[in-house]
């Protein structure tokens, strides 16, 4: 019998990753300030280093939690797509989920390459290209969940929240 809802662990991982991603996307100032100082040859103060470390450690936590989440997804599975929808909707959902997983690995890895290894191109990729792509995919993910709930009247949103 296919699962009808995500497990409690899957839900906790989903919303923990969502909260950490929101934190790093909405509050990147510590890393940005540290980067500006280093770029201009200035010495970061301990508070600057601490703020940058918080951003980096949140990114590492995201990487770890996404790896655990993906392992659980592979071993335990996920609820099936709702019936009665156009096949393109299922393909789009799969594409967005796959790209989100890829970005949630690429963002922390590129950030670590920039911060800990000093690889400038990784920093540019991280802060400009991947960050923009992540915002777009997050928008698509939220829009898709809302469309499932309000337009298609499916249980997709409920099974990641209350069910």
Report the location of each language-model feature.
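Membrane-embedded alpha-helical bundles that constitute the cytochrome b-like, heme-associated redox core
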Residues: 1-163
